[in-house]
Amino acid sequence: MPILIGEATDVAFATRFRQEILGKSQNHFPRLQNLLEQAIRNPATCDLLSACKLFALFALGEAYSTRTCQAEENFPGIRYYISATRMLRVLCEEPKIDCVEIMVMLSIYSLAMNRRHSAYCIAGYALRFCIIIGLHLNVSPQQLPDRELREHRTRVWWSAYILDRSWASMLGKPISIQDEDIDVNMPSELQSLPPSDTASNDDFADTDNFSASIRLANLGAKITASLYSRRSHNTPFSSRVQQALQDLSHWLQGLPEPLRKCIEHVPPGSTMHAVTLHLYFNQCLILASRPILLHVLRLRRDSSMGTLEPGTESISASAIALSEACVECARRSYRVLSDSSINGSFPTFDYTYTQYLFSVAIVLAISSVLAECTTDGDDFETAAQILEQLDQNGSFAAKEFCRHIKATSNMLIQVHAEREQVGHGLAPALNDTMGHETELLVGPLLQDLLSQTELNLQFLEASAIDHGFQTFFWPEEQDDNCR
């Protein structure tokens, strides 16, 4: 596999010389299944790099195939993870594309253990390894004649890219490389492969899903940087919110029709790819709109308690609509996640599904306070029960989220007690029926918001992020599993 060498170096000149003399090219990589079969037949032929890759794969396989783990038991796959990590320390001194593949798997596994900061660092390390190798740049057919090998380079790069963008968005951290520095083609189908070549065809399947995941991960990172970072912006907050919604709408409309329909409706029996894209899309919409929802809650509560500052602008129709859209997205994701919990397809140790469930639970809790909607309150309680069950099954992520859920539940009890004394809620209420009958991801509510030339969120400009939200610093003595 080619490694990027600076053309000005003596090593590059020597390499050019050997290429001219030998004129040799490389062939496509061996598939992982072949590597596993070879290791089973003859373990002596399995070198350190191959063993490390297999151990990383075994760790992921055990984590995602296990349904429950008791407190006295080791986390599923931890033995393989430790072995792979130790081997990788030796292998990392020499850049290889196999090392990037191993890092990608170890990053996903670290996240499953709720070591999300380690996962973020490993994903960033994988992306920097890609840059050292030169995977962020296209390789011409003259440099690498094997088309399958070129496609493999492309897919390894974008796999690391997705993790870097996704983890950065999840943690609110910077990305590792700017898009302007990337010159790589999107994944493509290798139509020239014969149908009998099932091994290579399987390697390069799901191109539409892969490309959609790349673009959505990029949008998620952009939304986080645009709305939640403390960098200086030349555009008002309302314009950045509207741009985020428009970008998400364009992403959805740009999907191939079969994939778009599957993601919009998520019919029974949908693939894991479609369900995950559906949930990720909803999460991006929630990210773009929940600052408005939280600020609407703050103004409503101040108004009901008579503590609203003089001169505060009234809440605009755009803000109300965005708040309703946020709740609508949460309800939609809740239905998908609760159904997956019922039918047994909810992966116990997958961090992202657990995080999505926690995210929508908080939005439903806010909706129950704003709208006095008993349905959203009941759904919040059900989501809390699912998280508690995941915690009992050994999910470290659910264990941490349950602490926040319990604190939220106690707060809701206090709010309801105050309402009984006062005799009213935070009027005017949000539309508590919105979203229950809507099937499309971008329904009439969001379409109306997207059609507006400018959202009226001026009441939020002075208090958005920089002034209204203080920076959080968690105590260092927290349990490592709950960071």
Task: Indicate residue ranges for each PLM-predicted region.
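Compositionally biased, low-complexity linear motifs
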Residues: 30-41, 185-192
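Extended, leucine-rich alpha-helical cores of fungal transcription factors
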Residues: 35-56, 62-181, 201-254, 264-382
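Short, polar loop/linker segments at the starts of domains and inter-domain junctions
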Residues: 2-6, 11-12, 31, 70-74, ...
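Substrate-access "cap/lid" subdomains that shape
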Residues: 259
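Short helix-interrupting loop/turn segments at helix-coil junctions
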Residues: 25-27
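Intrinsically disordered, low-complexity regulatory regions with latent secondary structure
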Residues: 1-23, 57, 145-214, 374, ...
